[in-house]
Amino acid sequence: MKKALIFGITGQDGSYLAELLLENGYEVTGVTRRVSVNTTERIHHILPKITIAEGDITDGFSVNKLIAEYEPDEVYNLAAQSHVGTSFKQPSLTWDITAGGVLNILEAIRYSPRKDDIRFYQASSSEMFGKNFDEGFSSKGISIDMKYQDENTEFIPQSPYAIAKLAAHHLVRNYREGYGIHGSCGILFNHESERRGENFVTRKITKWIGEFVKWRGGNEVDFLQDDVYHTGIVASNFPKLRLGNLDAKRDWGHAEDYVNAMWLMVGQKEAGDYVIATGETYSVRDFLDIAFARVGIDDWSNLVVIDPKFYRPAEVDHLLGIPIKAEKELGWKRKVSFKDLVHRMVDSDLE
């Protein structure tokens, strides 16, 4: 039985990855920090099937101890301070977890007597590209006539989070080439799910819709039968949905599809770096259209307020990943469409 050690198991990706590994017969250990609040909500249903180990990714001694004690065949690092906006407010914390933590894992693997038997996955981010992109190409019957990012696009990070992720990305490549560590990086574009944190714009939208429907005392069917909501009229005593840049475009996929790519990477004979994306880009406005339509609201303009405080410094306004390498070498392909992703998130928050 293979053993997997997951840093960041209580997050969106960690919970889906743990489920996938359990389905494939792994012995799964998840690393959590000792905190005063319960953080295991996303993995509560699988707690009897996994081992939870206390540890701190920012503490090298703690990481060394975990690698030595649990003897993993595969190590997945999904731990990070992953909110871009928060990284501007807490850059030091973001660096310590997102970059420093990766160095601690790599050093622990490097000095482990089982170094050659351990495979490491690092969650890199499309935010590393910043505002940079390539434009237009045609290869083997595939034509892209728009701005895009792939494994060859230059990284120009625009936030403390992206800078820390890029440092970690380069560290993995350096340890792979310099010390022979089997370390792969998934350059993950935006991926959401019903388990997405409420501080992310997609979940903020679907959670608000769920609360609004419940406040009205109706449900999806009621909205479809109530024409007053099609005009965008809303009671003044219900707080409106406050958002930032509605025209920012992202390549959005479902987290379940993306954790499958992680697993496929560590199973490759040779380690490498892969863009994991859908190859489609949509704006926040597009997300709103589909989300509100799910509950029968055609005109949401009077329900949403643009609030400048949600604009970020050095805003990245366009991300579109081309996952050709992952599709060819890993045999990976996304299964959940953008529309289905939005519907699943809305439906979950309506429950």
Regions of interest found by a model, annotated:
Residues 1-191, 256, 262, 266, ...:
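N-terminal Rossmann-like NAD(P)+-binding domain of SDR-like oxidoreductases, especially those catalyzing
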